[in-house]
């Protein structure tokens, strides 16, 4: 009986290995011209390009007193980067309007306990109790529109 299981295992492993090799080749082909666009901060992620390809909006942890992501906009020609979100609370899901004059993002900065939550997360991190990444639902997430010319934001969900 062991021989039968061994033969079945061997027979199945060959096609699986071939599929893995093919997937790796496809990935290498698609990712052959990658380059890093952001360097500052502890971590960064979830970036989206403007319709004309000149800018990218992304989330990054860069503020010393805030362990949560904030939203940044980078000019891909100059490298100039500006924070779009207010600097406190959690942020996510940013988007550049196709017209290029406004952006939108979700934020909890209106949460009365936003700064307290930041302090608690920093304390956990200092104690080595940092949580693994997970996307936590937060009832204080609202959607904001930010005008790139006036530098003003407005809450769209309240």
Set out the residue ranges of the language-model regions.
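Multi-bladed beta-propeller domains
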Residues: 25-42, 74-90, 146-158
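Hydrophobic beta-strand positions that form the internal "hydrophobic ladder"
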Residues: 53-57, 103-104
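Boundary at the C-terminal end of the N-terminal hydrophobic targeting segment
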Residues: 18-22
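A flexible loop/linker signature enriched in serine peptidases of the S9 family
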Residues: 39-42, 59-70, 86-91, 106-143, ...
